[in-house]
Amino acid sequence: MKKVGSFFTLLTSKGYKKVVLIPLAFCLGFFLYSLYSNFTGGKAEKTTYDDGTTRISAQSDLGSVKLPKILDSLNIPIHNELKIRNYDVLLDKDENITSIDIYCKSNKDANEIINWYKEKLNATDDRAKGEWNGFDMDVSYSEGSKLFSISLKKQ
């Protein structure tokens, strides 16, 4: 019983507050930073498989991730209201892009965004599907997950 009382005595004394509070604040700060980095800014992961193909992916649960620089030359149209949650980029042995899957979330009306993509892709049917910089591009919306899927496959 005396040991519990001595711990509270340590907390109430002026000189020893720093001994307890500084490490406690440091641990709390590290914990909050790890939560922040895990949920908001997913880091890109690069995985190389045995056959020589490579997969680049990133995911964010709360925030938005940025597309990798390798996709800058494709100039993929991303609607202003879409927040990218995750992406997968598959590369062949020669580091050429073979397919891209981008999943986005938005608070805007799904039909409005799908119609925007239909205009961009000059789609003539009901689907937002067309050709973009040498890739077959398909944009769809899932009611269940409330996610937009933007898929590009090499022609």
Per-segment meaning from a language model:
Residues K2-Q155:
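An acidic-aromatic pocket/loop used at catalytic or ligand-binding sites
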